[in-house]
């Protein structure tokens, strides 16, 4: 028999709203900041919100991981221990931690995951963490496929969590102290000042300026959507989307994009299966180029790559739309390869290489009427759309539905009926009950399917159940309303 490996799509949540939408759009697990001591000080959440997310996620067997991944001070250990117990009591599935001192605390039986802030880039480090009791290890972003495969071969029983999308650090994770040194804000305390996104000038030994005011340390964003199968074959079990500071539309779009990619792989590769329950249906077509990015890179996954930097700007350019033709009065004409919409955000690099932008008030063919002053743009300047009004309008509404398939079988018994329910994961239950019935005047198959299919606002939808048609074509319950009460 083929051994199947569960594959987890792990999505970020800044808050409860983002967490719920991550679940709705296909996440198998969601990671979210604790009330304190997370590596994103601006993304903390109350115990009440985390508990609400746990309750919702567990309907679909989606796991909730809470980040407690800063270096702790001695005087914070007691408070940390108390908080971990509270997280355990509300049903959190695991903690993502950095400080090994946490393992010395009086902990509840809650799984620990080794944060990427631990600098996990060798088989020896992963083996050490596994031997110390860690259930999952988040690998460093800068590893190649070969390095990931070697770690998996050395530690085959340890689930490996690999980043597949989002921002990249120019330094080794957990080993960067430049923010602390320059600004007194430690990345290992959740207060990174984003030093690597600032502009710098490059001056040689003779004082000659080689490059002036460019973002020399700013990297593009990671995008491994086209090489997911390679990552799975190398041993990755958890595919992680970065973005605990991103907004809800980012979470919706990016999670849905990776869910769609993975489901297509699972349809071909039966040795890989998803790690949660339910089927997602989207009211939009996910597009990674529609969400925040600094341009995309595979980073070092397939070896050293020269095209990993975003020197011009650390901000989101978005999708390239065309080029500037000319300015006439209160509008611009463009040579476009894609259509703009009213309300779109447009950006471009001016003659000094600085990022500029404007909002479109009205579009008329290839004419753009900016809201406010008409910007001066040199002909043939590349134009980008970093805000798609139509796409964002779709994402602002309900944009996905997630349902678990369940089948009903109603069987006739001498004293009533037996109602059997089975879901898509193989969970099955039969309830027998006394119930009045009468001889049906017409076949009841379709009527029974209709009545039992009224599942309302639940996580479930009807699916066929194991070759069973109508449980009774000649008898019927006296009251379908009372019968349906047994469904719940």
Language model segments and positions:
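Active-site-adjacent beta->alpha loops and helix N-cap segments on the catalytic face
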Residues: 41-51, 100-107, 142-155, 248-250
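Glycine-rich, proline-tolerant flexible connector loops at the mouths of alpha/beta enzymes
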Residues: 31-48, 68-72, 244-251
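Conserved small/polar residues in nucleotide/adenosyl-binding loops
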Residues: 481-488
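Active-site beta->alpha loop and helix N-cap motifs at the rims of alpha/beta catalytic domains
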Residues: 49-50, 59-105, 111-121
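Conserved, mostly hydrophobic/aromatic
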Residues: 22, 99, 129, 162, ...
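N-terminal basic/disordered segments at the start of proteins
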Residues: 5-29
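Catalytic alpha/beta core domains of metabolic enzymes, predominantly
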Residues: 111-113, 118-234, 254
């Amino acid at each position: 028999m083929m051994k199947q490996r569960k594959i987890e799509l792990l999505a970020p949540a800044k808050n409860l709203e983002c967490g719920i939408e991550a679940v709705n759009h296909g996440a198998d697990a969601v990671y979210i900041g604790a009330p304190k001591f997370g590596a994103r000080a601006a993304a903390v959440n109350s115990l009440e919100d985390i508990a609400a997310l746990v309750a919702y996620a567990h309907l679909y067997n989606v796991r909730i991981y809470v980040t407690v991944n800063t270096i702790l001070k001695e005087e914070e250990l007691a408070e940390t221990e108390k908080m971990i117990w509270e997280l355990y009591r509300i049903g959190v599935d695991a903690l993502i931690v950095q400080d090994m001192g946490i393992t010395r605390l009086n902990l509840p039986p809650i799984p620990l995951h080794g944060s990427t802030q631990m600098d996990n880039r060798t088989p020896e480090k992963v083996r050490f963490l596994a031997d110390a009791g860690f259930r999952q290890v988040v690998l460093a972003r800068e590893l190649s496929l070969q390095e990931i495969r070697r770690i998996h071969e050395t530690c085959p029983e340890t689930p490996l969590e690999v980043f597949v999308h989002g921002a990249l650090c120019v330094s080794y994770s957990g080993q960067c102290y430049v923010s602390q040194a320059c600004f007194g804000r430690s990345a290992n305390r959740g207060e990174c000042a984003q030093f690597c996104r600032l502009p710098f000038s490059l001056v040689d030994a003779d004082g000659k300026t080689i490059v002036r005011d460019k973002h020399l340390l700013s990297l593009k964003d990671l995008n491994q959507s086209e090489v997911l199968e390679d990552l799975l074959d190398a041993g990755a079990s958890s595919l992680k989307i970065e973005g605990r500071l991103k907004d809800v539309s980012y979470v919706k779009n990016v999670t849905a994009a990776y869910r769609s990619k993975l489901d297509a792989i699972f349809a071909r590769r039966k040795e890989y299966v998803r790690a949660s329950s339910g089927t997602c249906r989207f009211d939009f077509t996910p597009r990674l180029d529609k969400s925040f990015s600094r341009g995309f890179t595979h980073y070092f996954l397939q070896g050293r790559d020269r095209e990993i930097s975003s020197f011009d700007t650390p901000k989101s350019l978005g999708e390239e739309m065309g080029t500037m033709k000319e300015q006439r009065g209160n509008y611009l004409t463009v040579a476009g390869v894609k259509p703009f919409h009213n309300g779109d955000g447009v950006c471009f690099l001016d003659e000094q290489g600085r990022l500029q932008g404007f909002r479109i008030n009205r579009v008329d063919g290839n004419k753009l009427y900016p809201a406010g002053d008409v910007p001066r743009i040199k002909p043939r300047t590349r134009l980008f759309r970093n805000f798609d009004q139509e796409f964002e309008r779709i994402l602002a509404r309900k944009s996905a539905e997630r349902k678990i398939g369940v089948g009903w079988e109603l069987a006739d018994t001498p004293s009533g009926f037996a109602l059997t329910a089975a879901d898509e994961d193989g969970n099955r239950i039969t309830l027998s009950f006394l119930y009045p019935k009468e001889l049906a005047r017409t076949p009841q198959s379709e009527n029974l399917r209709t009545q039992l299919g009224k599942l309302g606002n639940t996580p479930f939808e009807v699916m066929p159940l194991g070759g069973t048609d109508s449980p009774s074509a000649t008898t019927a319950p006296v009251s379908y309303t009372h019968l349906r009460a047994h469904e719940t």
